[in-house]
Amino acid sequence: MRVFVYGTLLAGESNHGWLKGALNLGRWTTPPLFRLIDLGPYPVLSPGGRTAVTGEVYRISRLILQRLDVLEGYPGDYQRRLIDTPWGRAWVY
């Protein structure tokens, strides 16, 4: 499975360690279909806007996905949905 990350989960950012063991497939920019909401230290990606978001796509295990769910407060604070990427469908929070 795959995950698309942006913000604090990117390589070099404060929460990137949560992706330990994941394989970076590459950098990618979404189509301009989102809104990126600034909540201070944590950006939120929301559907229905006109913004393209640049991030990274990783191949992850089910265990890493479960860890990311804990970090993101899913279910609860964040939603998790599938988006299409050049490497196939990927989860995004």
Language-model segments: residues:
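Glycine-aromatic micro-motifs
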Residues: 1-93
